[in-house]
A protein has these predicted regions:
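Alpha-helical segment of the N-proximal tetratricopeptide repeat
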Residues: 30-58, 75
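Start-of-helix register in tetratricopeptide repeats
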Residues: 30-31, 64, 98-99, 133, ...
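Short coil turns that delineate tetratricopeptide repeat
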Residues: 60, 94-95, 129, 167
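Register position in tetratricopeptide repeats
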Residues: 41-42, 75, 110, 144, ...
């Protein structure tokens, strides 16, 4: 499961684009944050991070600047820094969203903090902005988090719910086979 987490790119792109759209729609941002957002959109993560850091250093638009830094670090796969930046974004007024919680959960998984990942995935699903695709992704990620914690029974329970909603998900069907080797079925 951990290897499959490292290889997901389609969802990663969707998450980043969603956060970028929110950042661009935010009114009242300084030109520094807007410049950083434009650089981020262009894929210039180093330059974008410099702009967001400049805004942080000046104490301007802290929530947006930290969120921008989080996305830059995320794109560079520096999950430790991304997690810290997203946390700072939330502490500085950035809106709590399902997307940020999913990204925080993935950061926690990638940095071997599965208990935190469980928290983020479970709570992130409660936000009203969580669309169907994001809920599906977070549900699957929650299973991965429980596996990493070592709670295979809970992972199996979550997998049963997941497959009742998404019965044709081949990745989940393969994962269920693995979970069945870790936890005997109830009939046994």
């Amino acid at each position: 499961m951990r290897n499959s987490m490292k290889k997901w790119n389609k969802s990663k792109y969707s998450l980043v684009m969603l956060l970028l759209a929110v950042m661009l729609a935010t009114s009242g941002c300084t030109s520094i944050v807007k410049e950083g957002t434009e650089l981020l959109e262009e894929g210039n993560y180093t330059e974008a991070a410099e702009k967001f850091q400049e805004s942080v250093d000046k104490g301007k638009d802290l929530g947006e600047a930290w969120r921008g830094l989080g996305i830059c670090y995320w794109e560079e796969e520096d999950y430790e820094k991304a997690e810290k930046a997203f946390g700072n974004a939330l502490q500085n007024g950035s809106e709590e969203t399902a997307t940020i919680y999913n990204m925080l959960g993935i950061c926690a998984l990638m940095t071997d903090k599965p208990e935190k990942a469980v928290y983020y995935f479970e709570n992130g699903q409660e936000f009203p902005d969580a669309g169907q695709e994001l809920l599906k992704e977070m549900s699957f990620n929650l299973i991965a988090a429980y596996e990493q914690v070592g709670d295979y029974q809970k992972a199996k329970e979550k997998m049963e719910v997941y497959l009742s909603l998404y019965p044709d998900d081949e990745r989940a069907l393969k994962e269920k086979e693995f979970l069945n080797t870790q936890v005997p079925s109830r009939e046994e």
